[in-house]
Structure formats: structure tokens, C-alpha cells
Amino acid sequence: MAGDAERARPVPPPSSGFSTPPPDRAPAPGGAGGVPHQDAVHPWLASYPPGVDWGALPVPATLPEMLRHAVARFGERPCLDFFGRGWTYAQLGAQVDRAAEGFRRLGVRKGTHVGLCMPNCPFYVISYFAVLKAGGVVVNFNPLHMPMELSAQARASDTRIMVVLDLEPMLERVLGLLRRPGREDGPLRHVVACRFAGALPALKGIGFRLARRASIGTVPRHDPQVTLFDTLLEAPPLGDGPAITPGDVAVLQFTGGTTGRPKGAVLTHANLTANLEQVRCWFHECREGEERLLAVLPFFHVFAMTVALNAGLAWGAEIVLLPRYDQASFRTALRRKPPTLLPGVPTLFKAILDAGTPRAMLSSVRFCISGGAPLPLEVKHDFEAASGCVLVEGYGLTEASPVCFCNPLVGENRAGSIGLPLPGVEAEIRALDDPGRALLPGERGELCVRGPNVMQGYWGEPEETARVLLPDGFLRTGDVGIMAPDGYVTLVDRIKDIILCSGFNVYPRAIEEALYTHPDVAAATVLGMPDPYRGESPAAFVQPRPGASLTMEDLHAFLAERLSPIERPRLIELREELPRTAVGKLSKTELRQELRERHPRGGA
């Protein structure tokens, strides 16, 4: 957690990125020019890639500072592209400045919580940095959430102002959260509505309005609680804005954490700028001012917010915005603006494969990073073979801003492993029954991390904060893993997902990996179901490839040759689609509830 000493440190331009390591930290052999050696405390040093210094610490900074330096360095370079309409860095900077004044006119002060409920679009980017420059705190909302979910998060986060697109049902749901006469319990005080068609090129904007009238909501006119985004840009200057420090809160990012109940992770400017610099340091082969990044993952998800938005702008990349993934829009973007960088989640790379995307369409892509969920070995191998680009698996969690581990771009890109700790990140495997006790390499336990990117805690949740943030500063991730003697970490499963079967620990990921080796399996997820004899047994839900003639009997026979008897699923069900989160990750929540309802007491 950021302390007063850290907040008092000088803040040079983010282009410098890292400070020299303090005396009590061992320098990494790659960037520091040392000879790789084995370190009992930091075994990953022996494997660290050349040119990357683990011992260097990110210099605390603020996100508006980062943007200001990016605008100064890359002013006339293309910054954003939205279906053919472009913004330069200078244009983005100017609109952020004007919108920040508008938010201040609306009453945003230092610490005011402002919700962003939008897919990827220019309004999100402008609002994100404008709220931060005005001193506010960004609270990301999933625009696909139902009214009850939006209301619960708005109340839990003390969100008072919400920015939303004028598309239905998004707009109606957010307007329904306003506190009005007869609805005094509404959590919101003000809504800022953005005209989606206004972000499109002129002809496309007209076409959208004509073709999609049913999708365009009605923004109330002359309503003192509703402001058009365009009006924000017309606000006259109010003078100097608030002083923002690295230790100030920047984002409340909601997560299920390790318990499944949504909680707001408190992320400071120092946390988020540290993580974007850690990512930039790891991907130091990226060419500043020359890259083009395809942003198909939603910015309201912390992985995309850090890797695609924050790091993308710090790199001086052109960011091509897609509001959602569909194969037609994706292929159009590949042809029109060939990307060099593609962050994604496993299901995105799987979808690209399943759609038969031609290798030539991916020829411009140099690096892909997969996060958000474990990357199946088959997906990694097949995607690299089909695309010709490097796909590295990383790992992170919302509570760490989020990226903590990644496989090297140069050196061993170890399949099945989340890689090595990023610069400044310390990692230990702790005993499952005693999170204060570190284990030796090769032993299985809970992965714990410590570093400048780790959150300050959960908003309004002191007990939950104390449960996951240990007294020595390490964060409990809730993931079971093994650290090899050379520092590479392999995750076995989530602690909450381990299936206790006849007294044995059964790991769903091992069963899922076996299922993915079947040529007719498109997606698979495994979880525990009540069993009157064993306590729990594995249950597998499988989505076949389109056109495949797959049967449950086929899969039972297939797994019988690959899994031990106790690992073999008692139940296998085929589904046309499996539940997914907003970023395309497979979700076990709905299936777990379904199994509880079908087998309330462990019956057959």
C-alpha cells in the first residue's frame, strides 16, 4: 500500500518510468547488466529476460500527468480511431481539458465518485481522464448489467454522477437510478448522456441514426439532472483545478474477489501508473509512437483499462476502438487499421481461431497478451500456429491493478505457466492452512503478491480488506499455484473451485485442459457438484464446435484414457453456449447455482 513516504517522492515524467532500486532490493540481471544467478528469495531472477530490470521500482505519478506527457510527445500522431473517425493526441488532450472543466461545473470535486457506464468509445476515454483531472474518482460499470446490479453498485460505491451513451436499454436503466420526487431512494444525482452517433464519422453517424432509431434513447430536454456531454465541452474555465497526488484514489474497480460478492478495489494513481509502467517495461520491445493497438476488450474491465488504454496511451499507440467483439467488425478493423498489438482473453483468441481468420489478416500483429483467465494449451499452440505471432500468457487480478505476471517475449515462453513476476512485484507461495508461511519451490499453495500496484483495500470493507491484505503487505490472490525453482509459476486452480472428492483435492483446470485436447470441444468448464457418497464430484459443461457430432458418451470414453478415476466427471452436459462474463470469460456462477438447485442435498 502506498504510504506517506511514497507519496512524498518526486515525480519525474512518466517516460522515465522507473527509479533505481533501493539498497535492500537485489538488482535483476537483465536490465542491470548482471549475470543471471539463483536467488533463494527471488528465484525468478535467474530466468529474467534481457533488458528488463526486476529491481527497479516504478516512480509514483498520476494518470493526468501521464496523458499530459503523451500529448506533449505525440501531439499530432493518431491517438484514437472509432469506425474511421480519428483523434490525434493533441485533440484528445484538448477535449479532456474542456470536459474536466465541465465536470467541475457539475460539482465534481476531489474525491467525487463518477460512474462510467459505456462500451469502448471516445466518450469513455475522454470522460475517464477528464474525471481524473477534475479530481474525481472513476467507478467503472458494466453497461450490460441489469438495473438491480447497477443500483447495487452505485449505492455500494457512493456514485453520484453517471456518464452513459444515449443507447437503449443503457440510457433508460441509468436514468432510472436518478433520485426524483417519488423515487427518493435513487442513488444518482446527475446523468451525463453522450450521443453515440456524434462519435461516428459524419456519414456513418447519419446512417446510424436512420437505421438504428429504435436503439437511440430519448435524452430528457430541460431536465436539470441530465446534461448532454457536448454541453460539458462548452463550459468556461474555472481556473486552476485541484492538486492531484499519486496517493489519491483514481478508480474504484468492482470485482468478485475471492468470495464472489462484488467489492470495490481502491486503486490509486500510484497503483495504476505503476502497473502501466510495469507492463511497458516488460514489453520494452514495443516502439513508442509507432504501435497500433486493437482494443476489443472493454475498458470497464481492469485488464483492458491498464493494458489497452493506460499503457497504450503511454506508448503513444494508435488505439482502434471496438465497442464489442463480432467477427465482421473485427475483420473490418484488421483490414482497415492493421494492428501490431492485440490484448485479449482466451475466448477471444479461440473465437478468432474458430472463425477461420486468415493468417494474412493477422500478419501485422507482433505481440498478443492473454489475461483474464487461464489460457488453454491448445488455444495457445493453435493460435500461434495460425497467426505466426507471439501469444504470451499473463496473470493479474483487479486488486493488483491488475497485471502481476507475464511470460517473456524473449526467452522461454512457457506453455501452461503464467510466467514470471513483473518488475517490482514480489511473489510467494503460501501454505493453504497458514497464509503467513512461505513454501519452497515445487510446493503447492496460495499465490501471494506484493508490489506498488497492489490496491489500498476494498471500499467500505475493512474486514474483507484485512482478510486478503496480510500484515506484511502481501495480497492473497485466492489462486493455488506452484513456483518452479527457476521462478516460473503455474496455477493449479482457484481455492474456491477446488473439488473435495472423497477427501482428495480435484482441480477443475486439469479436467478442462483434458477436455480441450478433444478436437470437437469449443469450450469447457468444470465445477463441483454435490455427491451423497463422495461429498463432491466433478461436473463438466461442454460447448461443441459448430457442426461437430459430439456425444456425452464420446467424452466419457475420451476422458477415461486421460484422467484418474477420481478426476473423471460424474456429469457431462453438452450446451450450445456456455455462460460468459462481459469480457468473454467463461463464468461458473450460473452453472454453480443451477447445480445447487438440481442437487440440493447431493441427490442424483
Task: Give each language-model segment a name.
Residues V164-L175, A197-A199, L297, Y325-D326, ...:
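Adenylate-forming
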Residues F103-T112, P236-G247, L252-A295, W315-A317, ...:
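Conserved adenylate-forming
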Residues H145, A152, D166-L167, L342, ...:
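AMP-binding/adenylate-forming catalytic core of the ANL superfamily
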Residues L57-V59, R68, E76-C121, V125-F129, ...:
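Conserved AMP-binding/adenylate-forming core of the ANL superfamily
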Residues T273-R292, F300-L341, A355:
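Conserved AMP-binding/adenylation subdomain of ANL enzymes
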Residues E291, A317, F367-C368, L375-G394, ...:
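Conserved AMP-binding/adenylate-forming
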Residues G115-C117, Y124, Y128, L132-L165, ...:
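Short beta-strand->loop structural element characteristic of the AMP-binding/adenylate-forming
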Residues A2-A32, R105-L106, K133-T231, P546-A548:
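Structural core segment of the AMP-binding/adenylate-forming
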